[in-house]
Swiss-Prot record:
Encoding gene (name): pen-2
Designated name of the protein: Gamma-secretase subunit pen-2
GO cellular component terms, semicolon-separated: gamma-secretase complex; late endosome; recycling endosome
GO biological process: amyloid-beta formation; membrane protein ectodomain proteolysis; Notch receptor processing; Notch receptor processing, ligand-dependent; Notch signaling pathway; positive regulation of endopeptidase activity; protein processing
Organism: Drosophila melanogaster
Sequence similarity: Belongs to the PEN-2 family.
The organism's taxonomic lineage, starting at the top: Eukaryota, Metazoa, Ecdysozoa, Arthropoda, Hexapoda
């Protein structure tokens, strides 16, 4: 999608929609929001909607970073403690590996 051809109010509307979509436990949408609108927020000449786009881009980046840290911590904790948690960990797993490393 080429957002450079869209008018500035449409860019703000898209950025806002992607920001609020990220609250539905979709941190990837926040990451896309940062990638698509970073140049609009920080590298383009000033325009009236730029401050709002900049705010949504910054909040999306913070949300993406937060989810990245939380998911990484959960993956490390689960992988290192899976066998110690016994049946509880098996109920949380889709694929149950044999034994432990």
């Amino acid at each position: 999608m080429d957002i450079s051809k869209a008018p500035n109010p449409r860019k703000l509307e898209l950025c806002r929609k992607y920001f609020f979509a990220g609250f539905a436990f979709l941190p990837f949408v926040w990451a896309i929001n940062v990638c698509w609108f970073f140049t609009e927020a920080f590298h383009k000449p000033p325009f009236s909607e730029q401050s709002q786009i900049k705010r949504y881009v910054i909040y999306s980046a913070v949300g993406t970073l937060f989810w990245l840290i939380v998911l990484t911590a959960w993956i490390i904790i689960f992988q290192t403690n899976r066998t110690a948690w016994g049946a509880t960990a098996d109920y949380m797993s889709f694929i149950i590996p044999l034994g432990s490393a």
